[in-house]
Structures are given as C-alpha cells and as structure tokens.
C-alpha cells in the first residue's frame, strides 16, 4: 500500500514539474503586451511620413484638435501600440504593428477593423454585411490616409474639371472597378455624372446597406423618387411597370436611347403590348413608318394619370 502511495505521489510530482516547464516555455515565447509610446517617438524615425500625415484632414484632427483620448494617440490609433516595435529597433513588419500597404501581408479584415474602431456608425453601419467587405476590399482601396487631398473623403483618385467634363473624385474611384458602369456614362443618354452634377453616392452607399445594389433607399423606385418626385404619385390610373420598378424600362447609368430607355420606343412598349394590331386599327399595320412613331405621342402620361379619363394614359 505504501509503495502505491509513493508511486502516485511521484507521478503527481512529475506531472506538476511537466506543467511548470510548459508554462515557463509559453511565458518566455509570448512577448510582453505592447504599450503606447506617443507621437514624438514615431516622429523621431518616421519624420517624412509624419509630416505628410499632419497635412491630411485626419492628421489635423488627431494631432491638433483631438476630441478624445483615442484620437490623441494619432499614429498608434491606427497602427496599434508601438513599444515592441521600438524595442526591436523598428523595421517593416516588426513589433506587431498594423500596416496598410498593399504588400503588407495584413488581411483585409485586420486593416478594416482598425478603421472600424472609429468608423462603425452612420454610413458604415452595414459595412461587414456589404459586398465590398465580403469580396476582400479594404478601406485603403478607396481612401488614402497619408497624402494631402482636397477631397473631404480622402479618396485615392482626384477630381478633374475641364470645359468639356467634370470628373468628380467619387466617380473616378468607383470607375476603377465598375468599368462597365463608367462606360455607360459616356453614352448619348446618361446620368449627369461626367458633368459633375451627380456622383455614385447620390444613389449608392459603397459602405453597405440592407437594400439591393447598395441603394440608399429601400427600393429602386424610392431611390428615383428622391429626385423625380413628380413620378411618385399616387395615381388614379397606375402603369404597373412604372409603379413596380423604374428599371423595367430605364437603364439608370446610360443608354443609346432617349430618356435612358433600355430599348427605343415603340419597341420597348411592344415588349409587353405585343398584340398583332393596335386596338383602334382595323388590321395590322402594313407600313414600316408605323414603327417610327412613338407610343408616347398619344400616351403621354405613361408613368400614371389622375385624369378621370386617363385609363389609357393619354392625359
């Protein structure tokens, strides 16, 4: 019995020694938690970058007019506490700092989380549920943090104004990826983005929304009614395609047809109204010139009518 007790005691002692060795090894391998060192320490090595940052909108807030303790950290507010970086003598990727270069190796989630520390409300509320986040885009894909820019959103593209067009910075940034939509803006009938009267963000929120196509409003029609209030109604006589979805007939970014129509009139109308003849004609049309006329010559109130005799949208 004594031998069994001694054996058990020995096994317990060996196990405790083993745990002690493992715990000591983990303690030695795990670096000490990093602490904040302050802006002046960063400036001592990164003077050119610090000078650039001080000229940006965000730099002016963090360095000269911080609103809370978090903003007072400035550099370390985005890159993280720098004590381990300083202790290791600096260098790219040393000390656990978050970096935002394209070749940094940081994941999109890590970079974006640094921004979302402050920018997680308002228009950024739905960022994590949006298509840009799910496709691995980072905030610095569109925004530049270390360069002075006249654009209030610190976008990576600058605007350009000439006598013939006005390239807004927002439109140029979106056009980097959405090349098909950018090309549509140069068609004969187009939204006035290339003239600078609208931007992509007048209709879309690139940071994400609970709505389709990242629309700012709950539906396509509600988005259109923001400007085209005369089309909202309510109407006594409703035209179902117009009531259900404006994009049934219109291509909002640009087309080769008048009034942003997807297909020229009357072919657009006959895609639904495909009877072999018009109700007021005794037989099918025999002249090609019939098809060169517009249905809206007679049915002018095609979006809807409140006239007592407006069943056919003629007035």
Language-model features, listed with the residues they occupy:
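Short sequence/structural segments immediately N-terminal
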Residues: 4, 16-315
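Bacterial N-terminal signal peptides that target proteins for export
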Residues: 1-12
């Amino acid at each position: 019995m004594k031998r069994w007790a001694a054996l058990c005691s020995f096994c317990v002692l060996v196990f405790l020694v083993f745990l002690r060795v493992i715990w000591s090894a983990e303690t030695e391998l795990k670096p000490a938690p990093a602490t904040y060192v302050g802006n002046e320490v960063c400036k001592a090595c990164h003077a050119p970058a610090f000078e650039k940052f001080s000229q940006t909108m965000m730099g002016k807030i963090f360095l000269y007019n911080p609103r809370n303790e978090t903003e007072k950290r400035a550099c370390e507010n985005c890159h993280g506490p720098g004590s381990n970086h300083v202790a290791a003598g600096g260098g790219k990727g040393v000390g656990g700092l978050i970096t935002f270069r394209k070749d940094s190796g940081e994941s999109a989630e890590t970079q974006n989380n640094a921004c979302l520390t402050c920018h997680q409300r308002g228009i950024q509320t739905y960022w994590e549920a949006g298509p840009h986040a799910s496709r691995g885009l980072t905030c610095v894909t569109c925004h530049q943090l270390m360069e002075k820019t006249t654009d209030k959103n610190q976008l990576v593209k600058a605007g350009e104004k000439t006598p013939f067009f006005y390239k807004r910075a927002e439109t140029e940034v979106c056009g980097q990826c959405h090349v098909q939509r950018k090309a549509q803006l140069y068609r004969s009938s187009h939204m006035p983005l290339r003239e600078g009267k609208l931007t992509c963000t007048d209709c879309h929120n690139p940071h994400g929304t609970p709505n389709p196509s990242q629309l700012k409003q709950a539906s396509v029609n509600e988005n259109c009614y923001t400007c085209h209030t005369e089309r909202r109604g309510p109407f006594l006589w409703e035209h179902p395609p117009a009531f259900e979805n404006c994009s049934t007939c219109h291509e909002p970014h640009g087309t080769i047809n008048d009034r942003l129509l997807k297909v020229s009139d009357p072919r657009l109308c006959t895609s639904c109204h495909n009877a072999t003849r018009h109700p007021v004609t005794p037989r099918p049309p025999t002249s090609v010139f019939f098809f060169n006329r517009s249905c809206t010559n007679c049915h002018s109130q095609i979006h809807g009518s409140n006239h007592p005799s407006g069943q056919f949208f003629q007035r």
